[in-house]
A protein has these predicted regions:
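Interfacial aromatic "cap" segments that immediately flank transmembrane helices
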Residues: 1-29, 82-101, 131-176
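Alpha-helical transmembrane segments in multi-pass membrane proteins
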Residues: 29-67, 118, 122
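Juxtamembrane transition segments at transmembrane-helix termini in multipass membrane proteins
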Residues: 47-48, 54, 58-80, 133-143, ...
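Alpha-helical membrane-spanning segments of integral membrane proteins, especially the hydrophobic core
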Residues: 52, 56, 81-108, 116-124
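Small beta-barrel nucleic-acid-binding modules, principally OB-folds
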Residues: 120-136
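Juxtamembrane "helix-exit" motif on the non-cytosolic side of transmembrane helices
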Residues: 34-43, 103-114, 177-191
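Juxtamembrane/transmembrane-helix boundary motifs in multi-pass membrane proteins
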Residues: 13, 17, 43, 47, ...
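Short secondary-structure boundary segments
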Residues: 4-10, 112-121
Length: 230
């Protein structure tokens, strides 16, 4: 039988993907901006503004939908702590922070490679770390006996650290390759789209696996014994 916390985790998947789309939009626009040498936007300031605007719009939609879905899920589960729903709006805002930081780095960093690499690192870290924190907050809102934040993150890290490291091993060289192409004037729209596509696929896989591992952690806590791992 599917437990309440597992139902709640899955009810938040769609909402999580919505605000997660803000990060994907950042990756796509940032990559195109890097490869078009000012053709997409007149200057980096305009590009940074566009990236931040896209993120704010998607983040706002995500916050509204997340609030609605979580409220509905808690009502169906007869939860008592509906005041915790407001915490999810905070997470919707948190989801927009990487975009703001990336925009600032683009504006002040110009064509400096370390700033592009740091931007990629921030996006990757946000995509990997915010998802388990989100589903943990949802679990605590409905299940007062759910694992503590430390235990759920420790469990997640023990199962997920190799994938986390593999992601950065793949994403950082990809960013460096993109910067190199841009620096030597050999970038093409095809390469830009391919780079954005690969990054999006990596983010998508990271999200699905993180949610799956978190669900397993909750089920193990509820049944009191290990269940089948991924």
């Amino acid at each position: 039988m599917t437990t309440d916390s597992v139902k709640l985790v899955f009810s938040g998947v769609i909402s999580t993907q919505l605000w997660f789309a803000a990060l994907l939009a950042n990756v796509g626009v940032m990559t195109l901006l890097a490869f078009t040498d000012g053709e997409l936007f007149p200057n980096l300031s305009g590009g940074a503004t566009a990236i931040l605007s896209i993120s704010i719009i998607l983040g706002a939609i995500a916050s509204i939908v997340t609030h609605w879905k979580l409220t509905r899920a808690m009502a169906l589960a007869h939860a008592d702590e509906q005041g915790d729903v407001g915490a999810w709006i905070v997470w919707g805002v948190v989801a927009m922070l990487p975009a703001a930081i990336i925009s600032i780095l683009l504006y002040i960093g110009s064509d400096k490679q370390p700033f592009w690499l740091l931007s990629s690192f921030i996006s990757g870290a946000a995509s990997c770390l915010l998802v388990p924190l989100l589903v943990h907050a949802a679990g605590c809102a409905i299940n007062r006996n759910s694992p503590s934040r430390n235990s759920i993150i420790d469990y997640w890290w023990s199962r997920y650290k190799r994938l986390f490291v593999a992601y950065f091993i793949a994403s950082v060289p990809l960013t460096m390759f993109s910067d190199a192409l841009d620096h030597y004037g050999k970038s093409t729209p095809t390469v830009a789209v391919f780079s954005a596509f690969v990054s999006s696929i990596l983010y998508f896989i990271i999200t699905l696996l993180t949610i799956a591992v978190t669900v397993i952690a909750y089920r193990e806590a509820e049944v009191g014994k290990p269940v089948s791992a991924i």
